[in-house]
Amino acid sequence: MQIEISAEKRELQGKGASRRLRGSGKVPGIIYGGENPAQPIELDHNNLYHQLKLEAFHASILTMSVEGQKEKVLLRDIQMHPFKPQVLHIDFQRVASNKKIHMKVPLHFINEDIAPGVKLAGGLVSHVLTELDVSCLPKDLPEFISVDVGELAAGNTIHLSNLQLPEGVEIPALMKGEDLPVATIAIPRGVAAEEAAGGVAAGDIPTSVQKKEGVAKEGEKKDAGKKK
């Protein structure tokens, strides 16, 4: 998904200038990194606010157009108002096509409804991670990574080493030997309690006990016959 952002160079800086800028419906921001100096910018608040709702905006290479000059950037930081739907400041980082980047990518969980642990055991899929830090060249950056839980049984766990990664994408945590859990299927307490209560069948009772009960019942039948 190609996303383009339009911005203008920001001449005035400082708290007062930023406050006036926000009052006029603009958002102060900055582009940094690479061989060029940092460039203060200003963006239209409404357009930016709607773009921020796109998942791909947070995990994709973006095309930044500053007064007609375009360059590739990544979203690096957003400052939001504590209780109003307002963007206070935004940071972008330039990217070079030949240098690896580190980026958090969202995880999309698929086939949850057909997982044996859900369909047969009544379990619930627990998302231990919802995003993943990856390393790759800009051209290889995925918008998301799919996690297939279609064969996951109750009590089992999917780890980082089980993920199917796009070509050219690496997981720094795995390279450090950290095979973190990604998703698991847990049995709710109510379901587990019902299974435990209903699990004591005749086959679960020791044979010696079953025999004693059988003898006792047979004796009761004979006594009843004599009384008649």
UniProtKB/Swiss-Prot annotation:
Q: What family name appears in the similarity comment? A: Belongs to the bacterial ribosomal protein bL25 family. CTC subfamily.
List the GO biological process terms. translation
The record's listing under InterPro entries reads: Rbsml_bL25/Gln-tRNA_synth_N, Ribosomal_bL25/Gln-tRNA_synth, Ribosomal_bL25_b-dom, Ribosomal_bL25_C, Ribosomal_bL25_long, Ribosomal_bL25_short, Ribosomal_L25_dom, Ribosomal_uL5_bac-type
Q: Which GO terms describe its molecular function?
A: 5S rRNA binding; structural constituent of ribosome
* Cleaved signal peptide residues: none
Its organism's taxonomic lineage begins at: Bacteria, Pseudomonadati, Pseudomonadota, Betaproteobacteria, Nitrosomonadales
UniProt keyword list: Ribonucleoprotein, Ribosomal protein, RNA-binding, rRNA-binding
How it assembles, according to the record, is: Part of the 50S ribosomal subunit; part of the 5S rRNA/L5/L18/L25 subcomplex. Contacts the 5S rRNA. Binds to the 5S rRNA independently of L5 and L18.
Pfam families in the record: Ribosomal_L25p (PF01386), Ribosomal_TL5_C (PF14693)
Query: What HAMAP family does this protein's entry cite?
Result: Ribosomal_bL25, Ribosomal_bL25_CTC
According to the UniProt record, one GO cellular component term is: cytosolic large ribosomal subunit
Protein name from the UniProt record: Large ribosomal subunit protein bL25
- Positions of region (Disordered): 1-21, 198-228
Biased amino acid composition, Basic and acidic residues = 1-13, 210-228
Q: Which gene encodes it?
A: rplY
Task: Report the PANTHER family cross-referenced here.
Answer: RIBOSOMAL PROTEIN L25/GLN-TRNA SYNTHETASE, ANTI-CODON-BINDING DOMAIN-CONTAINING PROTEIN, RIBOSOMAL PROTEIN L25_GLN-TRNA SYNTHETASE, ANTI-CODON-BINDING DOMAIN-CONTAINING PROTEIN
Q: What does this protein do?
A: This is one of the proteins that binds to the 5S RNA in the ribosome where it forms part of the central protuberance.
